[in-house]
UniProtKB/Swiss-Prot annotation:
One of its GO terms (molecular function) is toxin activity. Belongs to the three-finger toxin family. Short-chain subfamily. Orphan group VIII (haditoxin) sub-subfamily. Its main location: secreted. This is Neurotoxin homolog NL1. It is found in: Secreted. GO terms for cellular component: extracellular region. Expressed by the venom gland. It comes from the Eukaryota. Residues 1-21 form the signal peptide. Antagonist of muscle and neuronal nicotinic acetylcholine receptors (nAChR) with highest affinity for neuronal alpha-7/CHRNA7 nAChRs. Disulfide bonds join 24-45, 38-62, 66-78, 79-84. Homodimer; non-covalently linked. It comes from Naja atra (Chinese cobra). The lineage of its organism: Eukaryota, Metazoa, Chordata, Craniata, Vertebrata.
């Protein structure tokens, strides 16, 4: 009986996780905060600081894998919780 109950708990936890989607901020640095629901299997939120001359812009969104820092970037922040890229 304990084995059956444990099996049901494990199956329930696995099934509940299958439908989970991540929510990330997707606004640029000077625009109002907006969010997006990430596509299936896109579990990461990112925040990139981009240098554009003397101006620094921040870009946010969902991603499948964490982006790499490009020559024009200052930093990349990648996380895996809802709205963690503020």
């Amino acid at each position: 009986m304990k084995t059956l109950l444990l099996t049901l708990v494990v199956v329930t936890m696995v099934c509940m996780d299958l439908g989970y989607t991540t929510i990330c901020y997707n606004h640029l640095s000077r625009t109002p905060e907006t969010t997006e629901i990430c596509p299936d299997s896109w579990y990461f939120c990112y925040k990139i600081s981009l240098a554009d001359g003397n101006d620094v812009r921040i870009k946010r969104g969902c991603t499948f894998t964490c982006p790499e820092l490009r020559p024009t970037g200052k930093y990349v922040y990648c996380c895996r919780r809802d709205k963690c890229n503020q």
